[in-house]
Amino acid sequence: MKIISVLGSTGSIGTQTLEVVRNNKDLKVSALAASSNITLLEEQIREFHPKLVCVYDREKALELKKRVSDLEVTVEAGMDGLIACATEESADIVVSAVVGMIGIKPVMEAILRGKDIAFANKETLVTAGHLIMPLVKKHNVNLLPVDSEHSAIFQCLQGNESSTVSRIILTASGGPFRGKSLAELKNVKVEDALKHPNWSMGRKITIDSATMVNKGLEVMEAHWLFHEPLNKIEVVIQPQSIIHSAVEFEDGGIIAQLGTPDMKLPIQYALYYPEKRRYLPGKRLDFFDIAKITFEKPDISNLPGLRLAYEAMNTGHSVPTVFNAANELAVAKFLNREISFLSITALIEKAMENVTVVKRPTLDEILNVEQETYDFIERECVKSNYHI
């Protein structure tokens, strides 16, 4: 029996994680955490019977407490509650599927207590990789990627020495606006950006895919996870999302991981690692149904999110935090129809140019830079024309 805690249980990765649990009797849930969706969280509590739950929104937590008063479950709130779920004593592995830098503290606390981490919160590594990776090594825990691309790379590396890697090939679908001109991108609406061609994901990550910021975040994540320099991480557009990523070795051989676009595959792989693979219901890849597999170079001119990510990581220190925080707020403003689609990356670039760089930031300094970046974006939106 493997016992898991799920942070972000009502989101896209969280609900798919619970689908995997539902299909496997040797997985048990000890803790669930959500932001504010207490209707779905209550359903999850009644089905999976966790000991502990957290609702980040304190008012919603009080309401949930009343709703589940007939059950033996402890309801916590806020950051303290999130950390309590991440460190729940009986949990063997913590699924970190919250959105944004809110996941940093809970993940660090879980590692300190020797928990393995199934990792879907890339922002945590992007901003605090220099703090988290030494902890992973010190406490000898597994940091298991749940992103389809990083899981693919992780699988390709099994049985191979990392010293023999010559290149990591990180694939991308190109998002809904692959091949679009700058003129076409000027008139993009929220509904257009939320139509990903291949994957079913949450709203924020779907927008990140459209701007190519998501792939930039994944480059940073790959740097930390696989200890490779940026010049050995190459992004390749693979529009059909069949090749999830690949690794080239120094003898010229390339190992790739292929499959249908189903997030439950990397989730289940992480939950059971290092055990043997388990049966997973779902559609199988039929090579005879594939009309073609094509490859393209990413468009860093019209969709500069990837270029900005490389620049942020090359500068290092607190700049990846600025990149991430600026993107988080800009995406939220776009989804609220306050700014245009192209303004997202314009604001990121402006923030990277103006927010003070902090060298080797501590956790507190990372959070301060995050707030400073939010404040800068708010001021910039007031004084400049980023609106639709």
UniProtKB/Swiss-Prot annotation:
Residues binding Mn(2+): D147, E149, E218
Keywords assigned: Isoprene biosynthesis, Manganese, Metal-binding, NADP, Oxidoreductase
Membrane-spanning segments: none
Catalytic activity: 2-C-methyl-D-erythritol 4-phosphate + NADP(+) = 1-deoxy-D-xylulose 5-phosphate + NADPH + H(+)
Pathway where this protein functions: Isoprenoid biosynthesis; isopentenyl diphosphate biosynthesis via DXP pathway; isopentenyl diphosphate from 1-deoxy-D-xylulose 5-phosphate: step 1/6
One of the record's GO molecular function terms: NADPH binding
Amino-acid positions noted as binding 1-deoxy-D-xylulose 5-phosphate in the UniProt annotation, renumbered to this chain: K122, S148, E149, S173, H196, S209, N214, K215, E218
Named cofactor requirement(s): Mg(2+); Mn(2+)
EC number(s) on file: 1.1.1.267
List of residues binding NADPH: T10, G11, S12, I13, N37, N121, E123, G202
Stated family: Belongs to the DXR family.
NCBIfam families documented for this protein: Dxr, PRK12464.1
Protein name: 1-deoxy-D-xylulose 5-phosphate reductoisomerase
Organism: Lachnoclostridium phytofermentans (strain ATCC 700394 / DSM 18823 / ISDg)
